Amino acid sequence: MKLSLVVLTLISVAAQALALVARENLPKPQNDPFYQPPDGWESKKVGTILRSRKVNINTLVKDNLKEAWQLLYRTTYRSDDEPTTTVTTIMVPHNAQNDSLVMFGDFEDAGAPQCAPSYTWRAGLTSDVSSIFNVGIAMLYLQEGYIVTMPDKEGNKGAFGSGHVEGRQSLDGIRATLAFDKIGLNKNARVVGHGYSGGGIQCGWTAALKKSYAPEINSVGWYTGGTPSNLTALVERINGGPFAGYVAGGLGGVISTYPDVKAYTDKVFTKQAQKDLEFPQKHCQFEVVLRFPFKNFYDKSFSTVGKRFLYEPVVQKALNELTMGTNPEFTPDTPVLMAHGISDEIAPYEAAHKTYESWCKNGADVEFLSFVNPVSAHGVTTVTSSVPGFLWNRDRLQGKPVQNGCREIKNHDAGINSNALGEDFESALGLLKGLLGDKIGPNDEYLKDALHK
């Protein structure tokens, strides 16, 4: 059946209400001792586990997983000589498959510590309501019995949009998860990744960097949807529009990880600009979007050189480095499914397609799924692409072959085809079994019996 956006909205509203009930009074990451590494951590190898703890996942579902863990691990920023630490959250469903691992890219899209999934997925619905949609997608994998790991890929600098940082920290999160001996996961488990929007940046760069940074990981597929693969094109698309707040978040992430860009912007950005860029480092994405609707970041009140700051050589050098497909060295060596709506009003379709073309030219195996219905905007495609992305990754985890080379596919749907998921997902309720008190994982008959009565 086709689930309308109205039904999806009702599901989301109900989930939000339950998440409010589930909220715990948790210390924010900057006040939580778990996030502070022990002495000597800098000398450890990347991916080394420094701390671990059991946690409850309280966004959407509470206590219905078999277990959940968090790992503090050693990682880096853009280069090997920039050591840092971050956290990944591991969710283990009942009847979990121990030969498969899903790296899930949460689209937190802001730099504040309390926006990271290691906090929002424990605290319930706080200021970051995007966690509701992230959980809905992750539930597809959990219900199928896949262990899910979700790295805080922006690290301590809130590096939203800084792809090399996100990719490295995600790969090290996978390393840490595979090395963790308390969840029964095979050390050579098949690995896939799923990410949309900001999660698409994460997953796209994880795929691109894996060959050079973590070649030992047994990755078999990556899904990246609605991907802002070119940050220059992203800024040009959303500046002055309703989603202009993402400009502030993205600029802050790049500035925090490129010292030469910071040195330049410190000279040309106004005091007001500095205040504007601080906001996404303290607030989550919906607050950021609501703070800056229709703001023109090219205005002289923000930049003394107007729009020229974006095209200053030192800025363009960084943004070119952060454009997927520009460097042949960073070409995925594992099959990729890209999905994008032709009417995407945030992440330009043309830029994502150019990344597809570049990766294909450099020898990658990529499928590009275009949602060609005129209503296929960024938010709509978050929903419509979730099932194809899940099914494609499931095929990879099950060892089904993928067509070599590249191909393009067109999808005319404007809704989500839940029939494609099989009988366990005959209803929207099938995605929300955890909400009804049932255990999360395969082979649970409670809801299915209830639906067939």
Swiss-Prot record:
Active site (UniProt): S197 (nucleophile), D344, H378
Example GO molecular function: triacylglycerol lipase activity
Residues of the signal peptide: 1-19
Intracellular or extracellular location(s): Secreted
Ways its activity is controlled: The activity is significantly increased in the presence of Triton X-100 and partially inhibited by PMSF but unaffected by univalent and divalent metal ions. Activity is significantly decreased in acetate buffer compared to that in citrate buffer at the same pH.
Predominant localisation class: secreted
EC number(s) per entry: 3.1.1.-, 3.1.1.3
Keyword match Secreted: yes
Glycan attachment residues as annotated in the record: N98, N230
Pfam families (UniProt xref): LIP
Family: Belongs to the AB hydrolase superfamily. Lipase family. Class Lip subfamily.
Record's protein name: Secreted triacylglycerol lipase LIP2
Originating species: Malassezia globosa (strain ATCC MYA-4612 / CBS 7966) (Dandruff-associated fungus)
Organism phylogeny: Eukaryota, Fungi, Dikarya, Basidiomycota, Ustilaginomycotina
Name of the coding gene: LIP2
